[in-house]
Amino acid sequence: MARSETRPVVTLRSTAGTGRSYVTRKNRRNDPDRLELRKFDPAVGRHVLFREVR
């Protein structure tokens, strides 16, 4: 079974400027815009906003 293009792999980059990133999958039908999640950034030591990069 092939991977669906409906759920592509995206990279989330930290907005704190540390260069940290997470890799996740998203559903294009439910989230057509760029994904933004608050996740833990170990370089800063707290939760910050991570945005999808292309």
UniProtKB/Swiss-Prot annotation:
The keyword DNA-binding does not apply. Keywords: Ribonucleoprotein, Ribosomal protein. The keyword Isomerase does not apply. Gene3D superfamilies: Ribosomal protein L33. GO terms for biological process: translation. GO terms for cellular component: cytosolic large ribosomal subunit. GO terms for molecular function: structural constituent of ribosome. HAMAP family: Ribosomal_bL33. Belongs to the bacterial ribosomal protein bL33 family. This is Large ribosomal subunit protein bL33C. The lineage of its organism: Bacteria, Bacillati, Actinomycetota, Actinomycetes, Kitasatosporales. The gene is rpmG3.
